[in-house]
């Protein structure tokens, strides 16, 4: 087992990465201090892993309740969130009750938001079961739900007590979900570590096959990068925005297509290709770097051609973005591989990238 630390002073917490962790009650002991625990999971993950986590909590003498949510991005909304609140209230949960988020990014985001809101804040533990949530969304304290007009527009910063990433859970991931997680892995290399990006290029075939040793290394390095950024800028006042590389375009794709049509990682992957093209148009990265990002994204079985929403519709959707200021869209672009920055861009270049993004190159194919 590998343990990393998210250094946030009194709110610091560990990230445990390894195999066989769901059945390790001692990992939970320091982080579930009250008598009651509520596991929040979904219809897919619950039947696979909830009993194991429940047994660990009961081994610690805790009273445990399991809340099972519908599965999918389309359910990341108020009505689903209220299912968590209903369960907490009916169980008489108090401020020492610990919530345990057992699932992917949707479960983690909603459980964290419920923990931030219930009685103005109760503790929670992240137990991510998808690659995307293990390398990205479980770390950093961003919680929230979607609104029909924009992704993650309603939420709060609420740090978990711990993150427990059991690599064994990745074995049950469908190929599409695994690919979606690879988008965030690639992102971390692109924005912060060119050597890591090159390592992903060399090992992409084995990563696509979910090689456990390589997956553990990818989760570790991605968490190191994200934890380092979060420690410097917890509430996205500046540096943390670089973690949104590909997300301005990606969130527009998700909202424009309807939440759940594209997985978040699929939209981010395509968004990174678009952001790389825009970085190239503005003279920051060379043709080779743009091609490497596109080729690695495609090799990870992610879409590289954007849906045809219309240029004006894309721009309209991107204006509903947390980074936008006074209607001005901000993008995370690359100065070079391994170094990102936030900026506004000329309208003509943005429109050129959007026009190019929907075109299928004759030598490449869109990955469904």
From Swiss-Prot:
InterPro entries: Dehydroquinate_synthase, DHQ_synth_AroB, DHQ_synth_fam, DHQS/DOIS_N, DHQS_C. Transmembrane segments: none annotated. Binds 1 divalent metal cation per subunit. Can use either Co(2+) or Zn(2+). Its cofactor is Co(2+); Zn(2+); NAD(+). Disulfide bonds: none annotated. Its EC number is 4.2.3.4. This is 3-dehydroquinate synthase. The gene is aroB.
């Amino acid at each position: 087992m590998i343990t990393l630390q998210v250094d946030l002073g009194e709110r610091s917490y560990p990230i445990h990465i390894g195999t066989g962790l769901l059945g390790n009650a001692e990992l939970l002991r320091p982080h579930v201090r009250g008598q009651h625990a509520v596991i929040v999971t979904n219809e897919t993950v619950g039947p696979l892993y909830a009993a194991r986590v429940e047994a660990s909590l009961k081994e610690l003498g805790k009273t445990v309740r399991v809340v099972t949510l519908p599965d999918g991005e389309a359910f990341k909304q108020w009505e689903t969130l209220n299912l968590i609140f209903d369960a907490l209230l009916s169980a008489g949960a108090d401020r020492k009750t610990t919530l345990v988020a057992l699932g992917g990014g949707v479960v983690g985001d909603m459980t964290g938001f419920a923990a931030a809101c219930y009685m103005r804040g109760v503790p929670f533990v992240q137990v991510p079961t998808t690659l995307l949530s293990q390398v990205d969304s479980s770390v950093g304290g961003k919680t929230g739900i979607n609104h029909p007009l924009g992704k993650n527009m309603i939420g709060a910063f609420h740090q978990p007590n711990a993150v427990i990433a059991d690599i064994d859970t990745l074995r049950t991931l469908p190929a599409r979900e695994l690919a979606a997680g690879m988008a965030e892995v690639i992102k971390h290399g692109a924005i912060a570590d060119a050597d890591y990006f090159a390592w992903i290029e060399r090992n992409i075939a084995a990563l696509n096959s979910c090689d456990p040793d390589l997956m553990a290394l990818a989760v570790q390095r991605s968490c190191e990068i994200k934890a380092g950024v979060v420690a410097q800028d917890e509430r996205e006042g500046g540096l943390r925005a670089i973690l949104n590389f590909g997300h301005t375009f990606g969130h527009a794709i998700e909202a424009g297509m309807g939440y759940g049509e594209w997985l978040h990682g699929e939209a981010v992957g395509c968004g990174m290709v678009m952001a790389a093209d825009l970085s190239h148009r503005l003279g920051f990265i060379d043709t080779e770097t743009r091609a490497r990002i596109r080729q690695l994204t495609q090799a990870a079985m992610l879409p590289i051609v954007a849906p045809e929403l219309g240029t004006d519709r894309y721009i309209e959707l991107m204006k509903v973005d947390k980074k936008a200021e006074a209607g001005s869209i901000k993008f995370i672009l690359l100065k070079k591989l391994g170094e990102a920055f936030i900026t506004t861009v000329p309208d003509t270049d943005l429109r050129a990238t959007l026009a190019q993004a929907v075109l299928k190159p004759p030598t490449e194919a869109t990955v469904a």
